[in-house]
Amino acid sequence: MNKNKREKEFYSVDVGDSTFTVLKRYQNLRPIGSGAQGIVCSAYDHNLERNVAIKKLSRPFQNQTHAKRAYRELVLMKCVNHKNIIGLLNVFTPQKTLEEFQDVYLVMELMDANLCQVIQMELDHERLSYLLYQMLCGTKHLHSAGIIHRDLKPSNIVVKSDCTLKILDFGLARTAATGLLMTPYVVTRYYRAPEVILGMGYQANVDVWSVGCIMAEMVRGSVLFPGSDHIDQWNKVIEQLGTPSQEFMMKLNQSVRTYVENRPRYTGYSFEKLFPDVLFPADSEHNKLKASQARDLLSKMLVIDASKRISVDEALQHPYINVWYDPAEVEAPPPLIIDKQLDEREHTVEEWKELIFKEVLDWEERMKNGVIRGQPSPIGAAVINGSPQPSSSSSINDVSSMSTEPTVASDTDSSLEASAGPLSCCR
């Protein structure tokens, strides 16, 4: 494509404190979120005739870390296609050559709210269970390709008014190609698993701990382990769950074990005391979902010793979750990750830049030739043992509405603006 023709396809518009240079098919840009990795705005796509979210990556070539993260996010989003993971609709850059290349734009599905907002609402058992089921389905799909998310948190999970849930932001994900033990990585502290806090390395069920923390927050309406720093986070965990056994201590390296063993010992609290019945909605007559089942699931996910913690597969079979079980959703074909050494690769900024530019051009070429994967279909009427899933028209527990802007969560826990539009899956 010649320079003049390409330039005519784009226009520039100020969005907040940033300038977006986007394809003319995208109109009515409006800021909805920002964070360390990018700025997100909503827009109307005249080609698809739908609202979308456009994320402009923030200074992707500032240094090797930023460049590698941008490459990882783009590659993983291109590979993954599941109804519970945010769909990538388009990728583009206004620059026409590698020498000029500096901006990357990702176009994604637009959702109604993130889980931070849902946590402030009252949920009946059907909705709580169904949201968790989708969270686990999306996580399992990533795990099936050896991808560990590592950064699951309420602001990285988005929902629509019909209770559709999707996981997003893969810049912190990594592949598990080199073995079981992996290095610690800074994720949002409150949802960080003990094995990460203690530098033990981790396996796939590190994400299960995060799901457990999120579930606990949905039940309690507040963060379960609100640590003020790395050490305080561990203290908050053992104060509530109790000091782990000597068997667990022996798995720690010597310096960490010495520190942990010298901390005050806590007996912890029973899950009945941590999550009393009063925190839960009334038991569901519709499908027999009960507070006791939800509490049992929490007790299996929030286990300090990862070797004794429930797996994603086991969580999906739990009575509180498996009422929604659909093999087509749970056993969806794993994404094909072509670059098996995605996280082990090291390059200069210029090399990462060239790799990203090639990925963008590849997407543009496939779009031009019509060779682009279909997007995840709406959840529609999933069934619960033959009964329809909770929908926006459900009368269960007199659904009321919450006002939120349509939004895609940013990679921080802030910058989401509220205003109109019901989130009617919650009451």
Swiss-Prot record:
Q: Is the keyword Transcription regulation in the record?
A: no
Which residues are reported to carry the modification Phosphotyrosine?
Answer: 185
Query: Is the Metal-binding keyword given for this protein?
Result: no
> After translation, how is this protein modified?
Dually phosphorylated on Thr-183 and Tyr-185, which activates the enzyme.
Residues annotated as binding ATP are: 33-40, 55
Record key words, sorted: ATP-binding, Biological rhythms, Kinase, Nucleotide-binding, Phosphoprotein, Serine/threonine-protein kinase, Transferase
Which GO MF term does the entry hold, naming one?
protein serine/threonine kinase activity
Query: Which positions bear Phosphothreonine?
Result: 183
In the UniProt record, the signal sequence range is none
Pfam families (UniProt xref) = Pkinase
- The sequence motif named TXY is recorded at 183-185
| Activity regulation summary | Activated by threonine and tyrosine phosphorylation.
Residue ranges occupied by any Protein kinase domain in the UniProt entry: 26-321
Question: Where along the chain is composition biased (Low complexity)?
Answer: 387-403
- EC number(s): the record gives 2.7.11.24
Q: Which residues form the active site?
A: 151 (proton acceptor)
Tell me what reaction this enzyme catalyses: L-seryl-[protein] + ATP = O-phospho-L-seryl-[protein] + ADP + H(+); L-threonyl-[protein] + ATP = O-phospho-L-threonyl-[protein] + ADP + H(+)
Q: Where is the composition biased (Polar residues)?
A: 404-417
Found, by tissue, as follows:
Expressed at high levels in the ovary and at lower levels in brain, gill, heart, spleen, liver, kidney, muscle, bladder and gut.
This molecule's function is given as: Responds to activation by environmental stress and pro-inflammatory cytokines by phosphorylating a number of transcription factors, primarily components of AP-1 such as c-Jun and ATF2 and thus regulates AP-1 transcriptional activity. May play a role in the regulation of the circadian clock.
Free-text domain note: The TXY motif contains the threonine and tyrosine residues whose phosphorylation activates the MAP kinases.
Name this polypeptide is given: Mitogen-activated protein kinase 8B
